[in-house]
């Protein structure tokens, strides 16, 4: 199960994904929350030793500047600021959203026209399913970013310094399956409640993704930013 930034077309695409979950006008989104989610996403990728392209890190530095300015006390100025990085970013994001929507319309028209001139490919039937799965995986990854940040703080408060590095995905898969032995569903954050260090947290998450990939468990999120629920997809023998 690949969780990579290549799932997005660039930093603006990742930001648009985060913003779209609020279902409000781009200029009305809580920008600090969006920035924190973006930064948490990149931090999680780095913790999992996944490559982060330079363009995403450049955007991260710009977002941190915007966040710091938003958190500073408001100062009344005689003249409005000419260059507002927040408004500039939101304007870029709005322009990108229009561009992406237009490109999707063109792609759809091209797909329809292609069906008139050639035999429809079997793969077309499954394109929506694949896209929906990718979106689900992105959502679970974003949820994990929040869980990971909370676990880091919890482990820091416990002053835990000893960390193992020999956790195996296969072992964690068995532990997760054992957690389902007496129930058919679990909340995602329940899987990490007993984790002793960040290596175990990350390995548990990778094991969860593998179980999703082989259809041993399925994922549900009923509301935007809602709790991620994992469901068992096998019957006890």
From Swiss-Prot:
Keywords: Cell cycle, Cell division, Chromosome partition, Cytoplasm
GO CC aspect terms: cytoplasm
Predominant subcellular localization, coarse grouping: cytoplasm
Compartments (UniProt record): Cytoplasm
Gene3D superfamilies referenced in this protein's UniProt entry, alphabetically: 6.10.250.2410
InterPro entries to which the protein is assigned, alphabetical: ScpA (IPR003768)
Entry superkingdom: Bacteria
GO biological process, one term: cell division
Family per similarity comment: Belongs to the ScpA family.
Function: Participates in chromosomal partition during cell division. May act via the formation of a condensin-like complex containing Smc and ScpB that pull DNA away from mid-cell into both cell halves.
NCBIfam families noted in UniProt: PRK00104.1-2 (NF000993)
Subunit and partners: Component of a cohesin-like complex composed of ScpA, ScpB and the Smc homodimer, in which ScpA and ScpB bind to the head domain of Smc. The presence of the three proteins is required for the association of the complex with DNA.
Name this protein carries in UniProt: Segregation and condensation protein A
Biological classification of the source: Bacteria, Bacillati, Bacillota, Bacilli, Lactobacillales
């Amino acid at each position: 199960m690949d969780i990579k930034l290549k799932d997005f077309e660039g930093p603006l695409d990742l930001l648009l994904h985060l913003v779209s979950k609020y279902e409000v006008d781009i200029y009305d989104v809580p920008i600090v929350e969006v920035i924190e989610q973006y930064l948490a996403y990149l931090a999680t990728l780095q913790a999992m030793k996944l490559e982060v392209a330079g363009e995403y890190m450049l955007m991260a530095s710009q977002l941190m500047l915007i966040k710091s300015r938003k958190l500073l006390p408001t100062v009344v100025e005689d003249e409005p600021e000419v260059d507002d990085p927040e408004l500039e970013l939101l304007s870029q994001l709005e322009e990108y959203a229009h561009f992406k929507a237009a490109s999707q319309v063109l792609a759809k028209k091209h797909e329809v026209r292609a069906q008139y001139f050639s035999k429809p490919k079997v793969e077309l039937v499954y394109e929506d399913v694949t896209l929906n799965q990718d979106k689900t995986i992105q959502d679970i990854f974003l949820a994990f970013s929040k869980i990971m940040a909370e676990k880091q703080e919890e482990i820091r408060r416990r002053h835990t310094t000893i960390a193992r590095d020999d956790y195996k995905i296969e072992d964690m898969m068995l532990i997760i399956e054992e957690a389902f032995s007496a129930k058919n569903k679990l909340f995602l954050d329940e899987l990490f409640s007993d984790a002793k260090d960040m290596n175990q947290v990350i390995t548990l998450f990778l094991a969860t993704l593998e179980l999703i990939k082989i259809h041993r468990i399925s994922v549900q999120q009923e509301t935007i930013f809602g709790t991620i629920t994992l469901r068992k997809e096998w019957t006890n023998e």
